[in-house]
Amino acid sequence: MVLPASMRLRGHRCFSRLHRSQRRHHGKWMVLRQIKRDRTLLRSELRSQHDTTCRCALVISNKVSKRAVRRNRLRRLLHNHLRQRLEQRTDLAGTWLLFSLRPDAAEAEPAQLLEECDSLLKIAGLER
């Protein structure tokens, strides 16, 4: 399943700010970047909405896999996992997260990716 619209992070300004973020947590297959929200970076129609949970984005480049089918499968797997973990967490409202998969992530087993995702959330202080 895809992340609900209330949890999605969109817009090049948001991604640029997250890429410059100092709060990075590195794993073997992915990198987690984290910042507090900055409403000025959002599109005008989203600025007035109140965040009920954190906003997330997932970046999977062509370096991970040349095949779109494989990249989409990884995206769906991680979106579903993040949705289950973070959708009900109202204490994380105002936090923006960016998960970037590394090129060798395509060789990892799905269980390993989900475990690393959880460990990065725990390191970042976002997991209970």
Swiss-Prot record:
Gene3D superfamilies: 3.30.230.10
SUPFAM superfamilies to which the protein is assigned, alphabetical: Ribosomal protein S5 domain 2-like
Any single Gene Ontology cellular-component annotation: ribonuclease P complex
Listed InterPro entries: Ribosomal_Su5_D2-typ_SF, Ribsml_uS5_D2-typ_fold_subgr, RNase_P
Record field: catalytic activity: Endonucleolytic cleavage of RNA, removing 5'-extranucleotides from tRNA precursor
Keyword Ligase applies: no
Pfam families in UniProt: Ribonuclease_P (PF00825)
Binding partners and assembly: Consists of a catalytic RNA component (M1 or rnpB) and a protein subunit.
Family: Belongs to the RnpA family.
Function: RNaseP catalyzes the removal of the 5'-leader sequence from pre-tRNA to produce the mature 5'-terminus. It can also cleave other RNA substrates such as 4.5S RNA. The protein component plays an auxiliary but essential role in vivo by binding to the 5'-leader sequence and broadening the substrate specificity of the ribozyme.
Protein name: Ribonuclease P protein component
The organism of origin for this protein: Synechococcus sp. (strain CC9902)
Organism phylogeny: Bacteria, Bacillati, Cyanobacteriota, Cyanophyceae, Synechococcales
